[in-house]
A protein has these predicted regions:
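Right-hand nucleic-acid polymerase module
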Residues: 1-160, 170-318
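Cys/His-coordinated zinc-finger cores
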Residues: 166
């Protein structure tokens, strides 16, 4: 039987992070956005289903009020879950057709002033395009998913630390045969692509799946896609630096795909078979005093939370 406490655990964790980041205060200059951020995740409703054959229970998220702001830990987590599921589906399809291994590549650039972040992002993007056109890259890499992160753990005030986290799908036979690219070579290739007069920090490592159950691969997918700025780094930012970061990254793409990871589409998410699963009821929860608490009815939930807008949630994001 499904445990609702366990299901709510991750929502609780990320809602608490959202409270700590306090986007409502960060966007105090934008009243409407501040209100949406402040209410994000304060309401959840789940549909409860029962398996007619086994009596097992399952809950699916039916509606909620999410802000969808990129700095929000709750919304970033949900976006990561959705995209990670899609990427995993694509990688499994690639594995069925090719003998592949996966690499986790991190590419950096010298820290720019925060006021130059937008220009630096564009410069890195162009450099990465050059890297993908290199014959060694084209010969070995079947596909990639690339994500950008804007700050590091110890980025100085007034600076940015844009860097890429990338999962590479490589031809296992050729890459680990005669076409292996060492970390020193990856560093050289990235330095050339950047046209840099310094040696950038580059890290490359093999992702090893334990017992073919994707444990490490799943971890790498989440590491790559998790967020563009760690929540605790956002907390450290001054209001002035946050506004500049928000301005510099407006409209910037967080994720990019290439090769087979772009061309092979994820399979549709499985849905509950209505012949097998019976709808039982809808359960309502409000975030009160640091945790989600159940409400007896939808009316009670609305009265307590003063919800102005609720969003239907697709099965892929449950």
């Amino acid at each position: 039987m499904e445990n609702i406490t366990e299901k709510l655990e991750n929502f609780n964790k990320h809602k608490k992070l959202s409270v700590k980041v306090n986007l409502k205060q960060r966007y105090k200059h934008n009243k409407k956005k501040a209100e949406v951020c402040g209410e994000c995740g304060s309401f959840l409703s789940f549909d409860l289903w029962r398996n007619k054959e086994t009596n097992d229970e399952k809950r699916t998220l039916e509606s909620a009020n999410f802000c969808k702001v990129k700095w929000c830990p709750m919304c970033a987590w949900r976006k990561t879950r959705k995209l990670a599921g899609e990427i995993k589906s694509t990688l499994e399809q690639i594995e069925a057709q090719y003998k592949v291994r996966y690499l986790f590549l991190t590419l950096t650039i010298k820290n720019p002033p925060l006021t130059e972040l937008r220009n630096t992002i564009k410069y890195m993007s162009n450099a990465f395009k050059l890297l993908t056109k290199n014959k060694l890259f084209k010969k070995n890499v079947l596909g990639y998913i690339r994500a950008i992160e804007y700050l590091g753990d110890e980025t100085k005030s007034g600076e940015a630390h844009p860097h890429y986290h990338i999962i590479l799908a490589v031809n296992a036979t050729s890459y680990f045969g005669g076409n292996y690219i060492s970390q020193a070579k990856w560093t050289e290739l990235w330095k050339q692509a950047l046209k840099a007069d310094y040696t950038p920090i580059v890290d490359i490592r093999t992702i090893r799946a334990k017992n073919e159950k994707w444990k490490d691969s799943d971890s790498a997918i989440f590491e790559t896609l998790k967020y563009c700025v760690a929540p605790l780094e956002l907390v450290k930012l001054s209001q002035e630096n946050f506004k500049e970061l928000d301005k510099q990254t407006k409209g910037a793409r967080q994720y990019n795909k290439g090769g087979l990871i772009k061309t092979i589409k994820p399979l549709p998410n499985a849905t509950l078979d209505p012949e097998l699963w019976e709808y039982m009821k809808t359960e309502y929860f409000n975030f009160v005093n640091g945790e989600y608490k159940k409400c007896a009815t939808k009316k009670e939930a609305d009265q307590k939370n003063h919800i102005k807008q609720k969003q239907k949630v697709s099965d892929s994001q449950n």
